[in-house]
Swiss-Prot record:
Pfam families: GHMP_kinases_C, GHMP_kinases_N. The keyword ATP-binding applies. This is 4-diphosphocytidyl-2-C-methyl-D-erythritol kinase. Catalyzes the phosphorylation of the position 2 hydroxy group of 4-diphosphocytidyl-2C-methyl-D-erythritol.
Length: 285
């Protein structure tokens, strides 16, 4: 096997996002539910026996040292393999959206190279490597919708009685993006949310809680407010995902997207029960 084609890297939505406190080192303590959706980037990876790591963009340009290449190099460093890879990335998930596109690309890269290079690492080992690159990467490696706490390191799959109902969502990405650091450094950010429970979330699901980053984001980026109003005018209840600037709403009825403002992107998405590559790494090392 020398090439892996059409590898999906799905986006996520934060169904709610609360901040319950702050650690002495300054990191915020979060509670959230991460949900996979079928808005995906696509990767194609070819084996390079010379040990080099290269990347080719099909679409919007990315920095040369993006999370895909960093993930590949981190996997090389962790295992000592002398194999390399050429990564072709087809971007579809918007950047600066709060949808985890870069983290998902990195997770798919780790899963694919673990297979292509014949490393045989289990999911726990891959998660350790992923966490060194970004807090959201372990979630995508787990490959299941999850309740997430702490700084992102506590991940509890929502399965069985807590599984998310199958539903359809519309996701809107305004033209403007947002810088995560500017939101978390804002003095007006709510940092004392009451701790939520999984049972409380399960009683309300898509109507539960709020995104405490949203008020700050709306101040920094008025297009977030405009996107929420655009969906509300169509009779849907909208909120922001992650640190924005994308917003989303559960589709309780069909809507038209023909009047989407110039420069915005919108997509109707289904939630996913499992990451398409969820079976590519064993749960135990």
């Amino acid at each position: 096997m020398r090439t892996l084609h059409d590898l999906p890297a799905p986006a996520k939505l934060n169904l709610f996002l609360h901040i319950t406190g702050r650690r002495p080192d300054g990191y915020h303590l979060l509670q959230s539910v991460f949900m996979l959706i079928d808005w995906c980037d696509t990767l194609h990876i070819e084996l390079r026996p010379d040990g080099g790591i290269s990347r080719e963009d099909m679409g919007a340009g990315l920095p040369a040292d993006d999370l895909c290449t960093r993930a590949a190099r981190a996997l090389q460093a962790a295992t000592g393999t002398r194999q390399g890879a050429h990564i072709v990335l087809e971007k579809s998930i918007p950047a600066q959206a709060g949808m985890g596109g870069g983290s998902s690309d990195a997770a798919t890269t780790l899963l694919a190279l673990n297979r292509l290079w014949g490393l045989g690492l289990g999911r726990t080992a891959l998660e350790r490597i992923g966490l060194s690159l970004g807090a959201d990467i372990p979630f995508f490696l787990r490959g299941r919708n999850a309740w997430v706490e702490g700084i992102g390191e506590t991940i509890m799959p929502l399965e069985n009685v807590h599984a998310l109902p199958q539903s359809r969502f519309v996701v809107v990405k305004p033209e403007a993006g947002l810088d995560t650091k500017s939101i978390f450094s804002s003095p007006s950010l709510e940092r004392n949310s009451e701790r939520a429970t999984i049972s409380g979330f399960a009683a309300a699901h898509y109507q539960f809680g709020k995104n405490v980053l949203q008020p700050v984001a709306e101040t920094l980026c008025p297009e977030v407010s405009e996107a929420i109003r655009w969906l509300e005018h169509k009779g849907l209840q909208a909120r922001m995902t992650g640190s924005g600037s994308a917003v989303f709403a559960q589709m309780t009825h069909a809507i038209d997207l023909f009047d989407l403002p110039t420069g915005w992107r919108a997509k109707v998405c289904d939630n996913l029960r499992l990451h398409p590559l969820a079976g590519w790494a064993a749960d135990e090392d």
